[in-house]
Every structure is written in C-alpha cells, then in structure tokens.
C-alpha cells in the first residue's frame, strides 16, 4: 500500500521583515515517520517551523506547504491546528492563575467541539487523562498546579507532550525538546517520544545537538545551513556531525 505524505513542502521560500530566511526548501514526511532537523544557530531551523505553523511575522514568497494534500500555505495558525498541526515551543510559557487541569480539558474539549461532540466534565476528562499521565510519567499533582509555573525543564517538556497527545495531531513539531535538560530528563523525554513513535505518531523534531539521537533514532536527518537543507540522510549523518562538527557540512557543500 502506498504511504501517504503527512507533510509536503515544495520549493519554499520565506521572508521576515522583507529578509529572505528560507531558500528553496523541499521536504516530505510520510505517515508514521520521524524526521529530525539539525543545524547551527541561525541556520533557519526555527524559521522553518514557524512558517509551517503559520507565524504571522513570516511570509511565504514562493512555494507550497501541504498537510495530507491540503494546501496550507496561506492558512491561519488556527486553520493549521484544526488540520492537525501541533507546534511545541522550545521554551513553554508559564501562566499564573490558569490551572493545568482546566487548561488541558479546554484543549481536549476544543478538539471535541470541532468533531461535533459535547464537552467532557472534569470527572469524564480525568478518565481520559489518567492513562496519558502514566504514558508521560506525570502524576496527578501536576493537574492542580498553575500552567508550567515552577515546573522544571523536564516537567515543562512532558507537560507540552501531554498537550500534544490530547490534541491528537497528524503532525507534531517539537522545537528542541532536549533544550536545557540534564541527562536524566533527556532520557525521560526520549522515552516518551519513543512511546509515541510506537503509536505511529508522525513527528518533526528540531535539535541543535546530537545527544537526543543517542536515544531517539529518526527515519531521516536533515541538516540546515543559511536557510537551506544542505544534507539529508539517516542517523549516521548525525553521528558524523557529532564527530566532525558543522564546519564539515560547510566544507562539503562548498
């Protein structure tokens, strides 16, 4: 059976404040695949994610973006979200006065509303949420805290992945989920990501370092530099990068 492409990017060029930041990007992620994008600071990794998510500061000047054959190039962020695009932030924000449980239930009920289903009350939602808490190694005390307030880096990342699971996205985009984590938190987050891969979640992950790939083995690795994808391969590409550094990529593409 032919695999469906969840994300297709064709000849994409984009700018911010009239400055072109992405140049002729081509990318295809098929059903159940996990792709990783790496690159030095300023290479265009985060810009690509923001363009996929529909950030209003970024303008597509050429090319197309498709999610399961639906053209989202000019779609609003809300429309992209409704089509199943989830973007996890590198630094999840803290919101004082917003209970974590209420926020998560609002996320889930919004998804149900789009499907024409009634809202779940707190007890009904807890039945849905409990096994997901186990999946991401979070206990129910997290539910009674303000959103991300006082959370460690690892707790913030797990909480965001929890939001992702509740959203049931077609494509989950994670911006440096390993950022600021110690080795134990990195292992914990990697374990959660691998559990989701086993459940056939399609993911695009941005990372600056190779450490995450010691625990998560992607289907493809893409290297970006100066707003372009300059190399594509499997995880051995990341291993070479760790050994030789980004200067090796610059030399090999010159």
Swiss-Prot record:
GO terms for molecular function: ATP binding; ATP hydrolysis activity. It comes from the Eukaryota. SMART domains: AAA. SUPFAM superfamilies: P-loop containing nucleoside triphosphate hydrolases. It holds the Pfam family ABC_tran. The keyword Transferase does not apply. Residues 7-251 form the ABC transporter domain. Keywords: ATP-binding, Chloroplast, Nucleotide-binding, Plastid, Transport. It is found in: Plastid, Chloroplast. Its main location: plastid. GO terms for cellular component: chloroplast. ATP binds at residues 39-46. The keyword Nucleotide-binding applies. Belongs to the ABC transporter superfamily. Ycf16 family. This is Probable ATP-dependent transporter ycf16. It comes from Cyanidium caldarium. The lineage of its organism: Eukaryota, Rhodophyta, Bangiophyceae, Cyanidiales, Cyanidiaceae.
